[in-house]
Design a protein with these regions (language model features):
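Short, acidic/polar
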Residues: 26-33
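Short acidic/polar active-site loop segments enriched in Thr and Asp
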Residues: 41
Length: 101
């Protein structure tokens, strides 16, 4: 995600809820707190987190948390589809990314 654009939207439209997706690779409390401090309303956590890690983040932040309960897991870093597309020649926009099911 474009953090610069997100910050501009937060400044210009303070009532617009901004969500951080898996492409922001938020996989720990520090990442969730950083987005919270920047003004994001919700974060979608990285897919590979355990239920215990998700619980810890939920209990220690005020930002809304969203997570995947089931689905394909990226072979590369979750949400970093460009790297996967460079390795395998598959486009993230065509939904033909390399995943582990």
């Amino acid at each position: 995600q474009d953090l610069g654009l997100a910050m501009k939207l937060i400044r210009e439209f303070p009532d617009l809820p901004i969500h951080g997706s898996t492409q922001m690779t938020v996989h720990n409390l520090n990442g969730a707190l950083e987005l919270q401090d920047l003004g994001f309303k919700r974060v979608v956590l990285a897919r590979e987190l355990s239920i215990n890690e998700i619980d810890y983040i939920c209990k220690n932040t005020k930002i809304e948390i969203e997570c995947f309960a089931h689905g394909a897991l990226c072979i590369s870093y979750s949400g970093q589809c460009l790297f996967s597309s460079m390795l395998g020649g598959r486009s993230r926009k065509s939904w033909k990314m390399r995943t582990a099911l």
